[in-house]
Structure formats: C-alpha cells, structure tokens
C-alpha cells in the first residue's frame, strides 16, 4: 500500500521527468529529438525489409506499404477529427489540394526508391535517397528563403559523407550497382521534397494523423493505380495481395513496414516537423546509409562495408551535428 508520503514522493519525480522532456535543446523540445532518433533507427530498417520481397513489382510493393500504413493512421485520424474544432475542420478541407500534392510526392518517392533498391546496391540506394538536404538547401537559396550558412555547410558535408559510403565496393558477391537504380534512388530523394515542405507548413496547426492519414492514402492510391497500369500485379496476388493473397511473408513484411518504418519512422518525422526544421530532419536521414548498410550486411543481404563506409559514417554524423547546432543558433 502506498502511503501519502510515497504517493507525494512519486509526483515530483514524474514532474521532473516531464519537465526534462519538455526542456528545449537547440531550439526544440527534448522529446522531439528523442523521437527523431527513434525515427532514424526505425526507417533505417526499411531497405532491408523491402528486399525481403524481391519478386514483388516495385510500385506494387510501395503501394502495399502505403495501404497498410494508411489503415493504421485512419484510427488516429478519426479520433483527431472528432475532437477538432470547426476552424481546424474548415482549414483542413481548404488544404486538400496541398494534401493531395503531398501524397503524390510521397507515392512517387516510395515507388522510385523501391525500384532503385531492386536494381542497385543497398548502400548506393540508401545514400542517394538521402540527398534530400541538398535539394532543400539549394532550393531555399533559389527561392531566397532564410537558411544559415551552417545548415548549408552541414548539408554539403552530409553529401560528402554519403558519397564516400557510395564509393565503397560498388559491386560485390551479393550486389551489383546499376546507373538505372542510382537514378531512381536520386529521383526518390527529389520527390520527397514536396512532401516535407507541405508537412512542415500545415503541421503547424493540423493534427498529425489528419495530415499523415490522407496523404498516405493518396500515396497508396496513386502507386496502386500506376502499378495496375504498368506492372504485372496478378503474380503477386493483385493490388491487395499483401492482405488477401494468403502468402504470410507478404502480410508480415508489409505490416512491419507500416508499423516500424511507417509509424515510428515517417510519421515520427511528421510529428517533429512542427518543432524542427525540414533541413534538420532531412539531414538526419543521412545516417540511414550507415545503419541500413550495416543491417544489410548483418542479415546477409549486402556485402561487407569497407573503410570508406567507416570514414563516411563519421562524416555523416558530423554533418548532422553541424546542422542541428546551426539551426539552434539561428532559430527561424
């Protein structure tokens, strides 16, 4: 039985914990940085999991991932809609064109990336899909948006790091690099820019699932439609094959992709965009090649990384720290 003294003693501890998580570090709450770290680790497993189903057409596989994630997000979106006030609901309806655009960008990102994963090495695909900070940084310059020199330098440093990882053993016993796969992966990095910019803006007032749910549903619909038109979907059970084909690996891999890289990873990124700049969030993705390549080697899908991967990984981490510190010193 808890005495009054013991109950009272637990309250300061709880308050101190909550205060610590709400404390700001480099211009954002501590919990946002913790969630960002969890998202990085979660999303780093996606490449390996996509490669568990190499015979499923890429657009179809991307659509499966989006379908499962959209179903999970629907529960949160319904709850947020019930408690939303009239102003939020009205603004949400007016934002639909932008949500649709964001969803198409997200679908294009995953479709191109899965195709890249299936046609080039894991390390190269992971590094090229993480060059988004360059598109954001130089896009900000072109549009005359406020971006600090430190953020730009960190983004460029991150590119140098992932370039070193990419230069390490292009071909090996298990993998072969192709320029087609490289171009697809680079295209995936470009397509996600629209998704991140829209999210950074509307997430300032829109609840998380009311944004991520519809956007993911649009991504699922767009990739499923394109897959049906240009791919042989029947061999994998059709557009809904992950749920109704009877192949357990289809269901298990798809649900993992939805729960871990999907909810913990990409939805986690959306959650912190309200507090952390898109350039910082996207630059954190530059850790994915190192983590994803190491995981691929550990499970026997990728070749052993060499010294360039080690040095490149150090450069990548340094670039992340550079951008975070620069953002904290130059809050916008």
Q: PLM ranges: what are they?
A:
Residues 1-63, 76, 104, 108, ...:
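Glycine-/small-residue-enriched transmembrane alpha-helix faces in small-molecule transporters
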């Amino acid at each position: 039985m808890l005495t009054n003294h013991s109950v009272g003693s637990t309250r300061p501890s709880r308050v101190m914990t909550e205060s610590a998580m709400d404390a700001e570090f480099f211009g954002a709450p501590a919990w946002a940085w913790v969630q960002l770290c969890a998202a990085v680790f979660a999303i780093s497993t996606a490449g390996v999991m996509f490669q568990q189903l190499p015979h499923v057409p890429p657009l179809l596989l991307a659509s499966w991932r989006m379908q499962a994630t959209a179903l999970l997000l629907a529960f949160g979106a319904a709850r947020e809609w019930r408690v939303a006030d009239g102003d939020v609901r009205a603004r949400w309806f007016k934002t639909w064109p932008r949500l649709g655009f964001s969803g198409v960008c997200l679908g294009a990102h995953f479709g191109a990336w899965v195709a890249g994963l299936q046609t080039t090495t894991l390390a190269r695909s992971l590094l090229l899909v993480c060059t988004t900070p360059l598109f954001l940084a130089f896009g900000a310059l072109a549009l005359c948006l406020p971006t600090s020199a430190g953020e730009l330098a960190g983004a460029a440093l991150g590119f140098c790091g992932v370039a070193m990882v990419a230069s390490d053993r292009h071909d090996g016993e298990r993998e072969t690099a192709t320029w087609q796969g490289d171009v697809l992966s680079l295209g995936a990095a470009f397509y996600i820019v629209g998704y991140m910019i829209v999210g950074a803006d509307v997430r300032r007032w829109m609840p998380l699932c009311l944004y991520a749910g519809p956007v993911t549903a649009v991504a699922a619909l767009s990739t499923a439609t394109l897959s049906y038109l240009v791919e042989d979907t029947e061999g994998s059970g059709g557009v809904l094959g992950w749920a109704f084909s009877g192949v357990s690996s289809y269901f298990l891999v798809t649900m993992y992709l939805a729960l871990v890289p999907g909810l913990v990873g990409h939805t986690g990124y959306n959650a912190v965009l309200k507090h952390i700049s898109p350039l910082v969030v996207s630059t954190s993705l530059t850790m994915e090649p190192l983590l994803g390549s190491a995981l691929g080697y550990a499970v026997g899908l990728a070749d052993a990384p060499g010294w360039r991967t080690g040095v490149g990984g150090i450069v990548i981490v340094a670039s992340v720290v550079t951008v975070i510190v620069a953002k904290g010193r130059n809050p916008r």
